[in-house]
């Protein structure tokens, strides 16, 4: 088997990833310009990305009596100060506007008898959001001069002299290669799951918090192209209902359930109420012999029972089925909780591309938005949309500039370079497709499991209670590099398996950068998220960003000063 031909396409804007941020960016670009757009989506935009199964709340909203600055302060506190306040503020100022636009497109937002949105806490409003992604996808599909290419797996940027020219990939179904040239490129590929050994084994390994199909592709392409990354050491670990990995917020906020240990003691206030502290408290209670830990639902009303079962049917039906199977309602049994494996996701933590306030990366012409963009945690759905809108507006502005300078190289030089890189990638695709089983040592799945075990054991996974030390990280680095070498001899029987090969390569690249970040921050600022046993205390000396950039095959660490309230960062060095 081999690659089935080559399609060369040209567009004004290439959007890689048709999830929340990517789709919303496309709507904004077409609303404000006549620019042509190609959206390259690995799955199908109707049900792809984090919104695939729907959501029951907008978790980032400025409710009545609050202001955008309040949201900035909340996110800053949760991240213990390691945030970009300029990014948080520009996002927060748009949260309500993008929500209103989604309502106009058909999203059902619950309202009280006075016509006001029904709040769920200080930053959330309730919605009927099972169909939120199809609503967004339908709006994109109705746009003129927008081509959506589903089942297209982008593997590489085309970057010359730190300027992006487009991207290369292949169709998972047809095996056709694609070289897409664009004036501007937006990366909206989501975060990275599957780096660590998951909660559940075997067939159920993808029963996880974050989409298992988000494999860090955008991160890996940026890393390999020399883009600067930030704060990967701020991993995200979700506190979830045990086994089903269903959300806990619906119970905690919906019925006011507290975290309790097996003795019935409320322990959450003992450790703190930030996201990482809630996970850490649960871990410590189990280590110290007071587990299992639960959300206390015993004693809630029958109406609350029904409300919870209906809510979970809408977004995590396995939790409702578990209640039914046990023969007990939530009011009759507490809900056991556990932490997930760690993820790299810029929508909840500050990890991702280092961007300026317009969401430009350090590669000229390349933007990042949503879970792939760093510095701006607690984005959730509306924050991803806001970042897509911010990037889109700057893209339109740049495309409309009459004084725009040409690249330092000619069009013919750019064409020659792009074609050469595309030919190299097609050759690489074919090497994986043509390699027979007898010529490879391990399958892609075996290598993925090996990678996850290494990260779990030596880089702070579930088995080590999310803890690590420098000696362990050194071993993790060595072993991940060994697995990366073995991955070069992987093989694929078809185009779908070829995608798995590249997903493995993407994860390995992200793992290497993550390990360097965990090593570089010599403190424990976020319990569980980055629990460094060699440096168990927090220090003001580390009130700074840990950034990295791959240069000549090596990952270089760079420290940057915090961007505080009233400050704005623009790329200069």
Language-model segments: which ranges?
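Core beta-strand elements of the Rossmann-like FAD/NAD(P) dinucleotide-binding domain
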Residues: 8-11, 174-184, 362
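N-terminal Rossmann-like FAD-binding beta1-loop-alpha1 element of flavoenzymes
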Residues: 13-39
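Glycine-rich FAD pyrophosphate-binding loop
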Residues: 31-53
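Glycine-rich active-site loop/strand segments that organize a redox cofactor
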Residues: 59-91
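Mobile, glycine/GP-rich and aromatic-enriched active-site lid/loop segments adjacent to catalytic centers
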Residues: 96, 103-155, 231-380, 385, ...
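Helical element adjacent to the flavin cofactor pocket in flavoenzyme catalytic cores
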Residues: 129-156, 160-163, 168-179, 219, ...
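Glycine-rich loop(s) and the adjacent beta-strand/alpha-helix scaffold that form part
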Residues: 187-246, 381-394
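Long, amphipathic alpha-helical stalk/connector segments used for oligomerization, subunit docking
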Residues: 400-493
